[in-house]
Design a protein with these regions (language model features):
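Extracellular/oxidizing-compartment recognition motifs
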Residues: 1-341
Length: 341
């Protein structure tokens, strides 16, 4: 049974918060227990505060009119006799992907609010599934798009929401129609983080600070800051820089709204905090950070986490010509950067 927060879906013109679903349940057995989940959109799955996802951007990017993929998780040993907290955070993925009419995603027949279907099983018996016993609330993610970026307001966080049994501010979900596509188990290599890269240089501009991560790559930012409530931080990502900041010409189109070209926004709460986007992905060498002070503009403020499918090498290449070696290195990094499933 598929459930969603509602029928309204996220667009550039009208932002809709990513929904967080929650269910409290008891489990008085230590037998084999599994969770099967699929989503139209993307999901993050949490059990008693721990994230279960095997992969970034789960379950798999697909056209839900044709194929929808599901994942299975073995949760034996992770359950309590009483008050287990199961949470599902949904993002838009490709179901609501804005592309400024380049590939006509805006008019796709499958466009809808993100939704998911889940079964919790003990052995072969389904104990419960996604239904109206799940409750739903807005998450602090106020906008998410796989390419355009993500916007997050830390002041909307619900304290300890992934572990607390409190259901205050949660309401009933909407039971919705299933997708048209065939349901298939996901057997692809997971999308994983490949280290974390610090800036090799930081340069002040008229509007902020440019962080140079040394090479073009794909992935997500990791922001760490001590801030005051309400401080707004804008993160713009690009492959090149111009005279007054990052240059989007290699990654945008004539119709593009530049406020939605690889642009993340983080609204701070009080104190020390960290942020990594959940449902977006950027290709860049440079990040322009706006809204921070000179004291905050340190290398520790922003790092970059390369993210790509977990694909291994089957051979290595090395020769006595350093130019050729460098070209091979760049080519391999470019190949990995373009493999998300």
């Amino acid at each position: 049974m598929y459930i969603a927060k509602g029928k309204e879906y996220n667009t550039i013109e009208r932002h809709v918060n990513a929904p967080l679903f929650k269910r409290i349940f008891d489990c008085k057995t230590n037998e084999i227990s599994t969770i099967k989940i699929t989503a139209v959109g993307l999901y993050r799955l949490f059990l008693n505060g721990k994230e279960l996802n095997k992969s970034w951007f789960a379950p798999y990017l697909s056209n839900p009119d044709e194929i929808v993929f599901y994942d299975e998780y073995d949760v034996i040993g992770q359950l309590k006799p009483k008050n287990n907290v199961l949470c599902v955070l949904l993002g838009n993925g490709f179901v609501n992907n804005n592309d400024f009419n380049i590939w006509q995603n805006e008019t796709a027949t499958y466009r809808s609010a993100p939704k998911f279907d889940l079964q919790f099983k003990i052995g072969d018996e389904t104990v419960f599934e996604s239904d109206e016993e799940f409750l739903v609330a807005d998450s602090p993610i106020t906008f998410d798009d796989f390419r355009c970026g993500e916007r997050y307001d830390a002041n909307l966080e619900i304290e300890n929401v992934l572990e607390s049994t409190s259901l205050e501010n949660f309401g009933k979900p909407l039971i919705v129609a299933p997708p048209k596509g065939e349901i298939i188990k996901n057997s692809a290599q997971p999308v994983v983080a490949a280290g974390e890269r610090s800036a090799v240089a930081i340069k002040k501009t008229e509007t902020g600070y440019i962080y140079d991560f040394g090479v073009n790559d794909t992935g997500i930012p990791h922001l760490k800051i001590n801030a005051k409530k309400g401080q707004k931080i804008d993160l713009y990502f690009a492959e090149t820089v111009g005279g007054n900041g990052v240059d989007f010409r290699s990654i945008s189109f004539a119709k593009s709204n530049l406020e939605y070209v690889q642009h993340d926004v983080y609204i701070c709460k009080d104190g020390i905090q960290e942020y990594k986007p959940s449902f977006t992905w950027h290709g860049c060498r440079y990040a322009e950070v706006c809204g921070i002070s000179a004291e905050q503009a340190t290398k520790a403020l922003l790092t970059f986490i390369p993210v790509h499918s977990s694909i291994g090498k089957i051979c290595r290449f090395q020769c006595d010509n350093e130019t050729i070696n460098k070209l091979v290195e760049i080519t391999l990094r470019s190949d990995k950067s373009n493999v998300i499933f």
